[in-house]
Amino acid sequence: IEECFADEYVAVVTGGRAENQALLNQRFDKIFFTGGKTVGREVLRHAAKYLTPVTLELGGKSPCIVDSTAKIPLAARRIVFGKYLNCGQTCVAPDYILCDKAIRDQLTDAIKSEIRRQFGKHPLENPNYGKIINRKHFQRLQGLIDSSKVVIGGQSDAKILRIAPTVMKNVTWEDAVMGEEIFGPILPILTYESLDDAIQTVESHPHPLALYFFSEDKAAQKKVLDRCHFGGGCINDTIIHLATSEMGFGGVGNSG
């Protein structure tokens, strides 16, 4: 960046809370913030002093709904890609799966097979598989894994801060992994009885930054798009909505 831009145009500042506070006291023309809700509120509070326009991208638990008409192999391949990209450390990663109860086992098996295909039998040894950003986050993620519900993965290596692609089923909203945005390579699978139940579940929680829906039913697709509130998303894919510059990017409510 320094080779291309003078400091007065583009500057990168790294640091912690002290640096954040110093930046927030500057009189910027525009602030675009990516982070969590707590700091997002602080950004808005400081920006109000100068009436500075703000765009917030605050993440959240982005659902991936899969109904009984979905093409299971396709869904598994694209969910695994979207979830484990950068070890799940992306703001728009599918946070959890909400699938039709009738296809749970079939979808779970397909996801397990796809994880092995994409990352090998020993992903912790795969040089192309990433690591967790720091030790604090690594330990936090380990605390979200319930070994009794793991169907693949769960292994970790503290020396290199790696956690294998992990899938958990028989998960409920009372589990620790559902209490906050995961931001890591852990994929909980929950089920629903009807699509209306799934929509009600999504809408009963803070609006997510992204939503993904796998279905071949056009009416079902329209229902989800009409009734669910979210920032951006895809039908029969994940993540790829970021690839177009023709769409805006942001969340709704707590997600930005």
Q: What kind of feature is each model-predicted range?
A:
Residues 14-22, 26-27, 35-42:
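Beta-loop-alpha module in the N-terminal Rossmann-like domain of NAD(P)-dependent dehydrogenases
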Residues 10-12, 54, 150, 189:
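Generic structural signal for residues in well-ordered beta-strands
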Residues 6, 27, 50, 93, ...:
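Short loop/turn motifs at secondary-structure junctions
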Residues 28, 65, 116, 162-256:
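Conserved C-terminal structural/oligomerization subdomain of aldehyde/semialdehyde dehydrogenase
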